Amino acid sequence: MKVQNLPYRLVLLALCVLLCSACSVNRQLARQADQLVARKQVSEVSCSGPQNCAMASPFHALLDEANRATSATQPIHFVNVLEQGEESLLMRIHLARAARHSIDIQTFIWVDDDAGRLMLDELLAAARRGVKVRIIADQLFSLEDAELLSRLAVIHRNLDIRIYNPTFHKAVTKPLEFAASILCCFKRFNQRMHNKLFLVDGELGIVGGRNYQNRYFDWDHSFDYRDRDVLVIGKDVGAQMTRSFEQFWNYKRSARLTRLNDVNSRIVAETDQGHDLPPAQISVDPARVDRLRVHASDADEMDRRFARHALRVGQVDYFSDLPHKLEGSANNHVLGERIAHMIRHAQSRIVLQTPYLVISKRAQKIFRDLRERENRPQVIVSTNSLAATDAFYVYALSHKYKKRYLKLGFWIYEFKPFPEDAPELIADYALLSGGTDSAGYQRYGQAPVTTQGVRVGMHAKSIVIDDTITLIGSHNFDPRSDNYNTESGFIIYDKAVSAAVTAAIERDIAPQNSWTIAKRPRTNLIHRFNNAIGDFSAALPLFDFWPFRFATSYELNDECAPLPPNHPDFYDCYTAVGDFPEVDLPLKTIYTRIVTAFGAGAVGIL
């Protein structure tokens, strides 16, 4: 061994020892924490009745009606599509108070802000009156506070939390640990639980795109999501949700809090630990929280706003990938397989809404096959613009393949950051300050924009097939959802639900809310040369240097009615507004160009 190599070998050995120690649970601390939790946990409940003092709810009557009408051959369910963020949070709080026996939750993100803490408070209240509450939260961006988790571990026996796929058996991942995990355990680190499920008594379930953070519920003062959830009521699909949740709950990567080294060490160290939670990390608008609490207790209001408008439907299926998605056959990719089947058999129209328009090679082949059919279906896509997205790296990859998607026949509409209909899409939009109180998880950053105010970004994930079948869930229809994350969603076979979701998406793609993406008009030989070079550059597997694109964004002229991008009068009625309208800083445009040029190899993981 050369002497000069010795320091490097010692450093490498030290890193290996560090990684090995981080990759195991401290079993002694875990045993001590288990003993302390068993001794400290409160087990008393405030209610001894058979329904644990559940609040009366109009949804109980809908559940009874659905269960009475369901037969062995014909299931019956009731459905409420939840378009507005605050109403989706209101529904969760109301159902938590109406829970009689159990509440089961899966989520990808849980931030300790107004919305996240309100939900925790309500779940704790349910546990204290006798309801069994179970939460599975993906570790990467959920409850990133070991002190809070150590309190939650002992606060009540009926509240049980597990953290999915923790990095190095810890609740909080530091930057160096984040990098080390990518280097040592890339495949496992990237397999995240992206499911969103809120299940009450095994028969009332909310599924969709929303996590637990202010921006998902119209409560962020700088950036809010345009998202979609759906409440489905009935025992038939309830059994499917329960079965899926149990698979995740019992999976080896769902870790009890005492199996997290930064949590169990705190449990053992804090001998005088109380049974109250520490203050929330982020508190923006306590008055708004209090108002929502009042509304959630008003059964008449919940009946008037939601239950009376619930749609009676027949078949509803809940699909979820299996937790061991990466460990076996394609049969573990349950939701992705079902989506592929639905699209492949579309006859007349596909309406797709996704925050990230980056589709897999397999999906591209399916759409190519559809394009070649004699009676090909129309494909309408609603997605984010660069100015609206909070993931500009992913947008840059979409930008690379925009011509390819247009050639597949997609009509693409990119959501504006300040849609004209924002006051109807976002609760109390006019009252939000446009300040900078946002905190917690942000994926890859937002592009600075030219307009001041509360920005809105698309986060809904839905497909409507042939105006009869609707998928609402967590799947982004991208390679990460296909290959790494576990995803879940409802597939609803009902024309009224399809009409409601289609109407919502058509509003999102209306000219006042979205830009239309269309090819640049072919005017001369230079344009054709540019097109040829652009095709060659975009076809390169890793690099794409050509800055001049086949397509750009268009705004409707005031004197015209909306037209599809393939209409012969389109260019008379629309004005090109550039590739990245309303993006302020040239530097962000440069970053986007760089990722477009070099980022193709990251499509599968971004």
List the predicted regions and their residue ranges.
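Bacterial N-terminal signal peptides that target proteins for export
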Residues: 2-11
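Bacterial N-terminal signal peptides
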Residues: 11-21
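Charged, low-complexity intrinsically disordered terminal segments
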Residues: 23-196, 200-606
